[in-house]
């Protein structure tokens, strides 16, 4: 790019979306400065995927869109412009070798999230992007015509620019710098904001089973949430009991649907401990177990059916006398046990807060953003990317892909 087309661009936020936007803008020939409030870049990247960084998901795009929870249509342009394969190619060609694991989740071969940040930082360095750390942005500078003219830092410094990209994140994992300040700045200038809520987050329960079963993981179970008779979520996988309630991959995914439709409401959830068996099949299996243990007490005959930690809870909930001999357990009591195993109901009272949430649901309403360019419809010359937007997806590398895609589109669209 030559002459008058070369612009001074400021990118606010050194996370996934901001770094990708800075790279795309610099590759387009612009003079780019990236401002990051923290002492290092990519602070949140370091903790994603338990420190391994789930870079993206390698599934086909049709399946990819089914994993987006909020505003998938808004994301068509950005994802088709810069899809998961493009992201994988970027990292592979910039010194970060990747591998695909279960569920098409993509990780660095090294299992170190730091390699992801290093690839981005090295690329920015090669392209001449100026990086300014410890620099928090507190306001925008607007020109007389209402278009963006730069930013004002927390130290009162005015940084003039032709274009500004905002990629300041949501509210989750606040210690990484995601405090929602960028969203509040945009609200001040007229952007509509969808209510921000913690998502991909553990549940708190009314019952005390969490404390009693703390640390117990249940694998290959079915978990569902109902709002009256309507199922809000129904999924299969692994969950975990914690001191406050439940967590684990299955619960974390379910939370995004709960937060979207039922946030703050007390609702019933159900665990099917044996989803591969119908009630009839399960009853036959229990009969067989009972036949083999007919002279044992009920409390001593369940070790093949449940993990040892779960047995006292199941006995209590079944309301069968633990001292009772197996051959004295009635058909009605057995049916009660079958129903409990297939439909163990618990009460969700709410979610944990932003400090434990993987992402933020809500943010800058997408109606105020051009999906083909990521430019603000409210402030010309301002572009938005990443988690500060009202976009979110399930776990598995999908949310980082949204950051890469929207960041890249913002960076190539500066005009």
Q: Across the structure, where does each feature detected by a protein language model lie?
A:
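N-terminal Rossmann-like FAD-binding beta1-loop-alpha1 element of flavoenzymes
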Residues: 8-34, 410-414
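Short hydrophobic core segments
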Residues: 10-12, 137, 151, 158-175, ...
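Glycine-rich FAD pyrophosphate-binding loop
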Residues: 26-50
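An anion/pyrophosphate-binding glycine-rich loop and adjacent beta-alpha core
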Residues: 39-47, 55, 61-62, 192-197, ...
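Glycine-rich active-site loop/strand segments that organize a redox cofactor
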Residues: 52-100
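Feature captures the FAD/FMN-dependent oxidoreductase FAD-binding
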Residues: 81-163
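A glycine-rich dinucleotide-binding beta-alpha-beta segment and adjacent secondary-structure elements
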Residues: 132-134, 139, 312-392
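Glycine-rich loop(s) and the adjacent beta-strand/alpha-helix scaffold that form part
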Residues: 163-209
């Amino acid at each position: 790019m030559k002459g008058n087309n070369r612009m001074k661009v400021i990118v606010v936020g050194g996370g996934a979306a901001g770094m990708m936007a800075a790279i795309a803008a610099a590759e387009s020939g612009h003079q780019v400065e990236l401002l990051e409030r923290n002492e290092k870049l990519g602070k949140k990247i370091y903790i994603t995927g338990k420190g391994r960084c789930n870079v993206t998901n390698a599934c086909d795009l049709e399946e990819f869109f089914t994993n987006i929870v909020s505003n998938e249509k808004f994301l068509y342009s950005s994802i088709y412009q810069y899809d998961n394969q493009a992201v994988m190619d970027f990292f592979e060609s910039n010194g970060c070798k990747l591998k695909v694991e279960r569920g098409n989740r993509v990780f660095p071969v090294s299992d170190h999230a730091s390699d992801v940040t290093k690839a981005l930082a090295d690329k920015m360095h090669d392209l001449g992007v100026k990086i300014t750390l410890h620099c928090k942005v507190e306001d925008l500078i607007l020109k007389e015509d209402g278009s963006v003219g730069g930013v004002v830092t927390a130290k009162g410094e005015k940084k003039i620019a032709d274009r500004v990209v905002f990629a300041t994140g949501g509210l989750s994992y606040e210690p990484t710098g995601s405090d929602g300040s960028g969203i509040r700045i945009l609200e001040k200038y007229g952007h509509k904001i969808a209510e921000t809520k913690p998502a991909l987050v553990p549940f708190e329960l009314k019952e005390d089973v969490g404390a009693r079963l703390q640390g117990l993981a249940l694998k290959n179970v079915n978990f569902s949430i109902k709002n009256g008779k309507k199922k809000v979520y129904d999924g299969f996988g692994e969950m975990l009991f914690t001191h406050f309630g439940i967590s684990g991959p299955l619960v974390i995914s379910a939370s995004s649907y709960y937060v979207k439709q039922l946030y703050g409401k007390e609702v019933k959830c159900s665990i099917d401990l044996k989803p591969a068996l119908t009630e009839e099949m399960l009853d036959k299996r229990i009969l067989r177990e009972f036949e083999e243990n007919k002279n044992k007490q009920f409390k001593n005959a369940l070790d093949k059916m449940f993990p040892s930690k779960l047995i006292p809870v199941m006995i209590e909930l079944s309301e069968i006398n633990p001292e009772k001999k197996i051959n004295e357990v009635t058909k009605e009591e057995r049916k009660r046990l079958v129903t409990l195993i297939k439909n163990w109901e618990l009460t969700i009272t709410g979610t944990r807060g932003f400090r434990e949430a993987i992402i933020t649901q809500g943010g800058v309403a997408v109606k105020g953003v051009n999906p083909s360019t990521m430019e603000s419809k409210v402030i010309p010359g301002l572009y938005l990317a990443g988690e500060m937007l009202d976009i979110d997806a399930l776990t598995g590398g999908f949310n980082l892909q949204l950051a890469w895609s929207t960041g890249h589109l913002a960076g190539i669209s500066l005009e």
